[in-house]
Amino acid sequence: EFRNISKVGYMLHNGGLEFKKISETEYEYRTTLKDFHMNAAGMTHGGFIMSILDSGMGTSAHQVIDGVAVTITLDIKFIGASKAGDEIIGYAKIKKQTKSLIFMQGELKTSGRTLATAEGIWKVIK
């Protein structure tokens, strides 16, 4: 079952994310797009797509270590478009974990269509 993970700060201000654990290495997260997430062309702003991926994948890293990790790299490929009212579902998968690093893959979808994919590395802080 999804639970709200946005208690304070940037993501709460921007609509929040709900999150759920699928397995020890896989997580899902979701949000619904609002008008203020759109760019001048009426599509979701790329910066917000990046924020959803960073927040969802970062929260997944935090869950795996039960601590804090920060983004070192995040490589995003924009594939499709979305609009206000769309529910965005994010998927995060832990590919490898060392004592100090977490390597992940992510994907965002709406209505079964891929919007973006990502690969990233998170540094374990504590």
Stretches found by the model and what they are:
Residues 1-126:
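Terminal targeting signals and extreme-terminal segments of soluble enzymes
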